[in-house]
Amino acid sequence: MTLVSPGPIHGVRSATAVICDAALEYGQLEVVVNMSQMTVSQMTLTSEGESHQHRLHYLAEHVLNWSGVPVVHIRPTVFLDNPLFTWFAVPALRERDLLVLPFGTGRTSPIATSDVARTVAAVLVDPAHGIGDVYELTGPASLDIDGLATENALGLRRPIRGTDIPHETWV
């Protein structure tokens, strides 16, 4: 079984808790592959710098661990095919050869969904091997806006410049 989103159901009950309950009642589940998020590795119960969705991933991991369900956590960074890097970036790439994103001094290492899929498939083929493990998946390099622009330039075979934009302007 693969769990992707720990979204809330009926207030305080979460999909994660319902899945754990069903898995324990069924009793024959080999593994739950939980698709989490890389930020979870830096979080604590009292940390405040992350989004609501990141907090839900953090809590979902703990619920799965506490439940006794056989689980493997997959923690990818942002997906390379995330709309942030595709749909939202396309107009400026097409019209001005610019990658315009609200990155500031930030860096990221986007990962291809196909790489994540291969990891999940490997876990599902041999689930007993990884029970209790956490796989943190990243792309090949940690890039700033200029590095992302360089990668786009290689793929598009034309010069692309990276341009930071304030988040307030971008949204």
Kindly give the residue locations of the regions a language model identified:
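Oxidoreductase cofactor-interface core, primarily capturing Rossmann-like NAD(P)-dependent enzymes
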Residues: 5-11, 22-31, 38-161, 165, ...
